[in-house]
Amino acid sequence: MSVKEAVAERFQEICAERNIKPNELANRAGVTPSSVYSMLDPRRKEVSVNLVKKLCDGLDMTLGEFFSTPKFDELEQEIQ
């Protein structure tokens, strides 16, 4: 699993737990809905740290809380 895939999956999990739709997440985070949908799109290969931070802020969680899951401990190194 790539870092981007793990990030998108983590946001999907959190939003599902909190019953938050992508448009609502965008509104809470102060970003465009297209930014959220782009981040969730499996065809997109990257996600910016700035976007992750804004989305975490919109969910009232820290980056530490977001990344503190085994999902991120098991990632393969990405060589480009």
Which residues fall in each region the model found?
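The alpha-helix within a helix-turn-helix
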Residues: 15, 26, 56
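Short alpha-helical DNA-recognition segment
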Residues: 19-38
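A short, Lys/Arg-rich alpha-helix, primarily the initiator
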Residues: 1-21
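Short, charged recognition helix plus adjacent turn
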Residues: 38, 67-80
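Short, basic-rich loop-to-helix N-cap that marks the start of a DNA-contacting helix
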Residues: 43-54
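Residues in the recognition helix of alpha-helical DNA-binding motifs
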Residues: 14, 28, 39, 69
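Phosphate-coordinating loops and pocket residues in cytosolic domains that bind phosphorylated ligands
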Residues: 8, 41, 68
